[in-house]
A protein has these predicted regions:
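Non-catalytic accessory regions of SAM-dependent methyltransferases
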Residues: 1-125
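Short, isolated positions in well-ordered beta-strands
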Residues: 57, 129, 196-197
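Short amphipathic alpha-helical segments
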Residues: 81-85, 138-146
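Non-catalytic substrate-recognition/targeting regions of SAM-dependent transferases
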Residues: 109-122, 142-210, 218
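A short interface-forming secondary-structure element
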Residues: 127-139
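Rossmann-like S-adenosyl-L-methionine
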Residues: 178, 182-407
Length: 407
């Protein structure tokens, strides 16, 4: 972790041996169960962290409500939080400069992975989308520093805050609506891999679009062929990348508003798609795959040359793991049954609690049950603008497997 200059005293939080060992191993979180003392520490404070004997371990942001009570920001003592924030934001922007030269949409700040816990910033052309996830980052003084630095460095037309009410409730923060923080523009068009997308900062999931899949969109396009099915297509990310390489593409999602945006995105890319029409189907993915893969009437079962599965996170916690793996297996089993010999499967999981080994074991089991031998072409993760901090495994969450059925 970057070192900062030493400075004056801060409130002190003492952690247990287990908590201090976790920090010494390079992680940046300490859970509430490992707090020994945090007497009279105001919510969202900058604090000095010590081990149970009182030895300083560094400086952190403190949450009085979250199960993650401590988020480390330096292994050295600091008090000038504004200077630290400006330095870290500038560092995050510089880190990405050589990685995003071919796109105007990317993640600018990725929380712990950029040593800025509780802050996420995405860029969509001239609009920045910000998420504040902790008590410390929600302080008015911190907000102002963040906005000023982003404005000075990136000169956006607008900055929009996307609010997750569940997170604010967990952090016992007052309710707040998503909205413009500065500027007036909330909608634009951005480009990924030469494909254009409509973006409205006050609509959609997460901070607006799935930027973490940008490199996987391009990779899937290299293998795409024939008739393609994009399941959980949302606003058409995979479908639009597949279409120039396929004879026919169908996108499936349960959200009518998302499909309406997907259709608008297809219209934006009319020339790139050579006038091809993408079929958009509003349906429950599990029900549709069950219907399409039915063996009751083999002559009626649908067959495809390329299938993409990009479902939402099935495992929000460890206790969801078994159910999540069952869900993933059902989806992949049905998709494998629908692929023609030599067909391409692109299958994803954005659940951190489903490890890469969990996911590959599930996929091997599905292939065995479907009697469709699978050969791996690529095992991929999130785009490089979503960096992975090796000492914080939670920063690695996206799995994307590209495979081909042998027969």
């Amino acid at each position: 972790m970057p070192k900062e200059p030493a400075s004056a005293s801060l409130p002190t939080v003492k952690v247990s041996p287990r908590g201090s060992n976790r920090l010494k191993d390079g992680h940046v979180w300490v859970y509430r169960s490992d707090i020994v003392t945090a007497d009279s520490v105001p919510p969202g404070s900058l604090v000095t962290v010590t081990d149970h004997r009182g030895k300083p371990l560094g400086t952190a942001l403190y949450s009085s409500s979250s199960q993650i009570a401590i988020r480390m920001i330096s292994s050295e003592p600091i008090t000038d939080l504004p200077a630290l924030l400006r330095h870290r934001i500038a560092g995050a922007i510089a880190y990405r400069a050589p990685l995003v030269m071919d796109t105007d949409a990317y993640r600018v700040v990725f929380s712990e992975a950029d040593f800025l816990p509780g802050l996420i910033v995405d860029r969509y052309a001239e609009i920045l989308s910000v998420q504040i996830l902790t008590q410390a980052m929600d302080a008015d003084s911190v907000r102002q520093v963040v906005l000023t630095e982003l404005t000075t460095t990136l000169d956006p037309a607008s900055i929009v805050e996307r609010v997750d009410p569940r997170v604010r409730e967990l952090e016992t923060l007052p309710p707040r609506a998503s909205g413009l923080l500065q500027g007036e523009k909330s909608a634009t068009t951005f480009t990924m891999n030469s494909v254009q997308f409509r973006f409205d900062a006050l609509e959609g999931q997460k901070t607006g679009a799935f930027l973490d899949q940008r490199e996987n969109y391009a990779a899937s396009a290299r293998y795409a062929k024939g008739d393609a099915l994009d399941v959980f297509c949302y606003q058409g990310g995979f479908a639009l990348h597949l279409a120039p390489h396929c004879t026919q593409v169908t996108g499936v999602d349960s959200s009518r508003p998302a499909l309406e945006v997907a259709d608008q995105n297809a219209a934006l890319n009319h020339t790139l798609l050579n006038g091809k029409e993408i079929e958009w189907i509003e349906a429950n993915a599990f029900d549709l795959l069950k219907d399409y893969s039915s063996s009751a009437h083999p002559h009626e079962a649908r067959r495809y040359d390329t299938i993409v599965l990009d479902p939402p996170a099935f495992a929000k916690s460890k206790r969801d793991l078994d159910a999540a793996l069952r869900g993933y297996k059902e989806l992949n089993l049905r998709a494998l049954k629908m692929l023609r010999p030599g067909g391409i499967l692109v299958t994803c999981s954005c659940s951190y609690h489903v490890s890469q080994s969990n996911f590959l074991e599930m996929l091997a089991s599905a292939a065995l049950d479907a009697h469709r031998p699978l050969r791996l072409l690529e095992v991929r993760g999130q785009a490089k603008d979503h960096p992975i901090l090796l000492s914080v495994p939670e920063t690695s969450y996206l799995k994307c497997v590209i495979a081909t059925v042998s027969r």
